Amino acid sequence: MFKRRLSMFMAAMGMAFSLVACSGAKTADTKSAETKAVEETTKSEAKSESTDKKNVVVTTSFLQDMVEQLAGDTVNVELIIPAGEDPHLYVAKPEDYTKLSSADLTLYHGLHFEGKMVDALEAGGVAVSKDFPKDRIGTMDEGGEIITDPHFWFDIDLYKMAVGVAATSLENLNPEYKDKYEENKVKYLDELTQLDKYVRENITSIPKESRYLITPHDAFNYFSRAYDIEVKAPQGVSTESEVANQDIQETIDFIVEHKIKAIFAESTTDPARMEKLKEGAAAKGADVKIVSGEGNELFSDSLAPKGQDGDTYIDMYKHNVKLITENLK
């Protein structure tokens, strides 16, 4: 509907432009080149509309990439939480609910990752985590409360399960493309298997005594479990949680005790938090480097914006592993 209205608006603008351009001309039938261009654009958009592609709404850049890998250009993909923004802190806008209400299919993470939108998503969406075995879903004790860890995408095996759910949902949406989606799924799953080998080879190349990953918030526990690298962060699984002085001090003591030489900022968190860790470690005689700045931050809760390094799941994972390996070896 929105596109149709936009096309009508552009056509009306074209007519207005034509009347101005033709003022004083010999015949009213004379059309400017600009008007013709507008009309061609309108026709092109009308043709695009006639293809009637289904609208798939996704909550995050991870799922946007997943759908694009599986469905290519057979669907229109609309993203709710822009790449680079923190999903834990994202507040839904009125237009987000408009997208959801007009979606033919909505895919979301589940596991309380989209907590502020969960009611709307559960009402009509598909959680890609819905088939995860319960014993594979991570939990943490935060202040005596057991919290579900939503960062499953750092366990590539779980991510593969999510791909399977997304593929089935797309096949149900567009049965005529089932063979194409199946072919793309098989290809993508093979690429993810190769990614797992890449990650394992690189992380195991880090000496065991140096294999510690310090980040601003607890987003890497699935990564830790899958690749035998101990992780620690002063903040919990959600960036909404409070950062207690005790947690900061415990992290500082951990850095000093294990002689950790590098700690990592994340693309969606405040790098100032890592400065506190560096200063605290320095006060105890430890020299620790903060790995941060454009192109040197870990991706945790979002992929990079389109066109930047890390704008696909596989590229994001390789970026993270390269950064970790280079700074901890």
What are these model-predicted stretches?
Residues F2, M8, C22-K329:
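Extracytoplasmic metal-acquisition and chelation regions
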Residues S7-M13:
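Sec-dependent N-terminal signal peptides
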